[in-house]
Amino acid sequence: MASQGTKRSYEQMETDGERQNATEIRASVGKMIDGIGRFYIQMCTELKLSDYEGRLIQNSLTIERMVLSAFDERRNKYLEEHPSAGKDPKKTGGPIYKRVDGKWMRELVLYDKEEIRRIWRQANNGDDATAGLTHMMIWHSNLNDTTYQRTRALVRTGMDPRMCSLMQGSTLPRRSGAAGAAVKGVGTMVLELIRIIKRGINDRNFWRGENGRKTRIAYERMCNILKGKFQTAAQRAMMDQVRESRNPGNAEIEDLIFLARSALILRGSVAHKSCLPACVYGPAVASGYAFEKEGYSLVGIDPFKLLQTSQVYSLIRPNENPAHKSQLVWMACNSAAFEDLRVSSFIRGTKVIPRGKLSTRGVQIASNENMDTMGSSTLELRSRYWAIRTRSGGNTNQQRASAGQISIQPTFSVQRNLPFDKTTIMAAFTGNAEGRTSDMRAEIIRMMESARPEEVSFQGRGVFELSDERAANPIVPSFDMSNEGSYFFGDNAEEYDN
């Protein structure tokens, strides 16, 4: 990134920090993790959960969701003003699973949001600790990215299902702040912008008046976030054009879809963070580990080390494969939904297989599912090596943007070759001359055509032994060139929307 100096690191975004040095950043991220852990311990006490029940990922998700809902100001206000039958706007809750007489039972719990907020603040030294809330949102988002393929959402906005590798963070709430914006993929931003433009086309008052002014500010801010993800001058110039449009309409939508397609080769920079479920942080804090004192990073060895020693359990449906459930959660914990499967497999030390071959549904259990036949098992979340998370998009040459990996948004900074069939991608660009100034388009298409698939991304970068905390001895893996390991292709993952 050319403007690297002006960018805040993820950890600064994560902790709303001003400029901090590495030690301060590690401490403030650690403080955030401490808070989540303390909150989780307190909630397990409130709910009278056994140690095993407290380590159940489904219980963790319910507890995380309760606190996120308790702090969702906008929705809380909406619920107060639009009361719906049988829903108390002041309460939040969800399913909690307990082991009774050798069987799993579902118990629906309900708490005052005020009470949950009190427990959360108490665990966070009286602060609202927004960073911790965002952290949990990103964990939920990473889990969704791994579980569901967003083809329907893509098709609805006129994009191509092959662009699913651009959809990281597509289920993050709007209120997820700078840390949330950093992990959103190019496709996610394009989708949000298209939705806004479409509303403007259908509603003539959308851009007018006081509300319209706020909308306009939001629109321009989203354009700037997306612009910041692109790494070539031509893509950025096109974003300026979209942002400055007096009356955004179909021409802008065309431009955005064109830009999204171009991002399949000229990859955007999208951050990756390892956000773990609260039931990992809780037991670690309970066992006496002081995250703030020791320091913690979301993009280094720390999450790997934490997962090496964590016991996490999951409910398993009768026909699900526990190993496959483990893979799903492992990928979510490492933010690896769009990583090359060859790279993930090497790091994990066991073969990581495509979504369509996994015999497992999502982690959450629907309220109408039968608990009688429900089992549980340990999730295997350990790894053989660790690697540094990247945000570069894997373009081999930052100055003149070259081939990033198609259908992949790299998570780990690990050398790999770029096996891809550029012709398929380029075919998407022929005969599409709508939209305006074609000089920028011509420039972008020229860059894409000159991208060479035989180049190597992240040259010389490797994985590290778990004993190598200082990342001193990189092990550069060699991969089988022939097939690129895309998680979602040739595949029938469930839809997030259904």
Curated annotation (Swiss-Prot):
InterPro entries for the chain: Flu_NP
UniProt PTM comment: Late in virus-infected cells, may be cleaved from a 56-kDa protein to a 53-kDa protein by a cellular caspase. This cleavage might be a marker for the onset of apoptosis in infected cells or have a specific function in virus host interaction.
Matches recorded under Pfam families: Flu_NP
Family membership noted in the UniProt record: Belongs to the influenza viruses nucleoprotein family.
Region (Disordered): 1-21
Protein name: Nucleoprotein
Gene Ontology biological process terms, A to Z: symbiont entry into host cell; viral penetration into host nucleus
Phylogenetic lineage: Viruses, Riboviria, Orthornavirae, Negarnaviricota, Polyploviricotina
GO molecular function list: RNA binding; structural molecule activity
Motif Bipartite nuclear localization signal, residue range(s) on this chain: 198-216
Motif (Unconventional nuclear localization signal): 1-18
Subcellular location: Virion; Host nucleus
Biased composition (Basic and acidic residues): 8-21
Broad class of the protein's primary localization: virion
Signal peptide: none
Coiled-coil segments: none
